[in-house]
Design a protein with these regions (language model features):
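Active-site core of glycosidic bond-cleaving carbohydrate-active enzymes
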Residues: 1-166
Length: 166
């Protein structure tokens, strides 16, 4: 929702991510000065991100899967932070019964992150038939992606039944 202000952790992560893409675009276009500038900005923002998640308020010690998946996928962390975030993600998944707990922005990343860690982790999440999860929908009769994990009954039948993919 546009009315919800993003958190500094999310905003900084996407700034680094987008600056990295801008750096690549500048390289393709042969704009070496712009490429250097975007790289410099991305490196500084990445350091800022690493400091931010080192604080208590934005700590990686969380069960919020998105907060762990995002920096792992975007490669925003130090080596020590990466090891911690991977271990913490597995703990978060264990705590949530290996059910999906990411939102729109991080769901596309989670299987890539898990597959890189161990293919079995990715399959374990993907093949979980409990709600919330990808296989819960077809198991309960869906042939499209629902807006709500619970399906049409969750909102009296008015929820989108052909929603942005989760």
């Amino acid at each position: 929702s546009d009315f919800i202000c993003p958190h500094p952790e999310e905003t900084t992560a996407y700034i680094v991510y987008l600056l990295g893409h801008m750096e690549k675009i500048a390289a393709v276009l042969g704009k070496s000065e712009d490429e250097k500038l975007y790289k410099k900005y991305a490196e500084r923002a990445k350091l800022g991100y690493q400091k931010l998640v080192g604080t208590k308020k934005f700590s990686l010690d969380t069960d919020r899967q998105a907060k762990l998946v995002r920096p792992l996928y975007m490669r925003l962390l130090t080596e020590k932070q990466t090891t911690y975030a991977k271990n913490r993600l597995i703990k978060a998944l264990d705590n949530y019964g290996w059910r999906l707990g990411t939102g729109f922005l991080s769901t596309p990343f989670i299987l890539y992150v898990l597959e890189e860690m161990d293919t079995e982790f990715a399959y374990r999440l993907l093949e979980n038939e409990q709600m919330p999860g990808w296989l819960f929908m077809p198991k309960t009769g869906a042939d499209t992606v629902w807006e709500s994990w619970e399906g049409p009954k969750a909102q009296g039948g008015v929820a989108s039944l052909d929603h942005y993919s989760k």
